[in-house]
Amino acid sequence: MFEARLVQGSILKKVLEALKDLITEACWDVSSSGISLQSMDSSHVSLVQLTLRSDGFDSYRCDRNLAMGVNLSSMSKILKCAGNEDIITLRAEDNADALALVFETLNQEKVSDYEMKLMDLDVEQLGIPEQEYSCVVKMPSGEFARICRDLSQIGDAVMISCAKDGVKFSASGELGTGNIKLSQTSNVDKEDEAVTIEMNEPVQLIFALNYLNFFTKATPLSKTVTLSMSADIPLVVEYKIADMGHVKYYLAPKIDEESS
């Protein structure tokens, strides 16, 4: 059987919030090393990859590998029934057609027990190659979310230009243009608030803002976000989940200015 217990259950609630608007259903691959998920969004433009390592759970048992087909909006609805302070346990038998979700208050005075039907999904696993990136920008996740939100008022695509000294986000539309430049921070006491840039060569790429705004739904999971870019390959937007894993979003650049 499979059983995973997470005292800080709010992490799981945040993970579902980060996924459910982008993908409707996905296969949760459960093994002794943890839980992983990989899925294209419904329009096959972006890819999301989630890893939750078993050692990040407070207790974890998986006797044999499972592939659980999950409707993410259903799971999100059930997780909304859990309080932010609740302990969450996920449980499934080896050949289960349902996933049990148990929510306990810290004082054990209230225990809620839900069962969610699983789906049969045919899933193709895409190999994601390990890449060296021309530019890797690490910045506060709230700042990135705000930039994407602000520039969405101007246009539907953002040009990200990365150089040694800073990164620039630009959008243009019928009402005009907007540019936001972040300089690399020279000395910051708090790592969470720093903007750091590792650059091998400058990069200038255009991305659809509506997808980036979907990705920023993961902001509550991490105080920082990492953007990895190279010409002609997908951007990677990564949110680390403390002591547990990460959620990574992949988005191919738009080909040229005229078509956007």
UniProtKB/Swiss-Prot annotation:
Residues 61-80 bind DNA. The keyword Membrane does not apply. It holds the Pfam family PCNA_N. Gene3D superfamilies: DNA Polymerase III, subunit A, domain 2. It is found in: Nucleus. GO terms for biological process: leading strand elongation; mismatch repair; regulation of DNA replication; response to activity; response to bacterium; translesion synthesis. NCBIfam families: pcna. Belongs to the PCNA family. This is Proliferating cell nuclear antigen. It comes from Danio rerio (Zebrafish). The gene is pcna.
